[in-house]
Amino acid sequence: MLTNLIVDGNYILSRMVFALHKNNLLYGSLRISLDNTISTYKKMYPFKKIFLVSDSKEYSWRKKVYKSYKENRKKDSDIDWEFVHQCYSEFKKDLKNVRVLEEASIEGDDWIAYIIHKANEIGESNIIISNDYDIKQLLKWSIDPHYINIMTNETFNQTKIFFPENYQIFLNKLKSFNNDDIFSLNDNNDFINLLNNFSLKYTIESINPVHSLLLKIISGDKSDNIPSSYSVKKNGRNRGIGDKGAQSILESYVNEFGEISMDDPDLLINIADIICEKKKIGKSSIDGIVENLQLNLSIIDLRLHSFPENILSKINNKYKNV
């Protein structure tokens, strides 16, 4: 089965930097660790293409949409970041048989979204190595064309694998395929074995991509300084909607309106209405909440039609020439 590997370079770099710095091994081991990690990934499966994506060194295009985007990010001053960036640049230049994608104003998850979209159009699957949970909205599967997108990462010494909801249906369909082409059959078996090995070794989380996107739109994202769609000041602090509160709002939506469609023109209005009911505030607050939901959607949504045209054009041009 034709499958691509997408490696979030910022994820593997930061994971190694902090671990090596803690053990006073940064200068002697960073480059070796990066090389060994990519080598290990290459051996996982005969991937059609391997991509390494990185955030731009410049501000993201999202800063123009929301000027406080990622404003709370601070680098550890004890780490020699000049050395880290120099080492990482040399590592990227020396990579063989890996397509490196990085461009001004474009973030790693923008590249991941684009690669996945292009691959899925022609029936190619993707394995993403990242701890960026915005990527959860891209985890899905299809029978025609036939593909699946999964994500894996390691946090706190625990490796997780994120499968799209009901992925077993996809695997069962893959197993049942009758194909006279013995090479394609073998490819399918190899891919099934890879996913089975993941399932045996790693902690599995099942992801509903639409719910994953909406949960972040409702609750915001503190790590990126994206505010909650609704907040109230208590004891001098803004109290927004947390993960559990957002989950409760989505459950109420499904109970009242049925399964969620991102194409529903009344989606955000109905969510805002439920927020008003949950928080026991007047309906006059709906318009303000909808504006906040729309802002968060414009920042978090990784569907390509949500990207500014100039950004999408830059991504497309770089992708074609890499």
Named regions from a protein language model:
Residues 1-95:
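Domain-level signal for Mg2+-assisted phosphodiester chemistry and nucleotide/NA-binding surfaces
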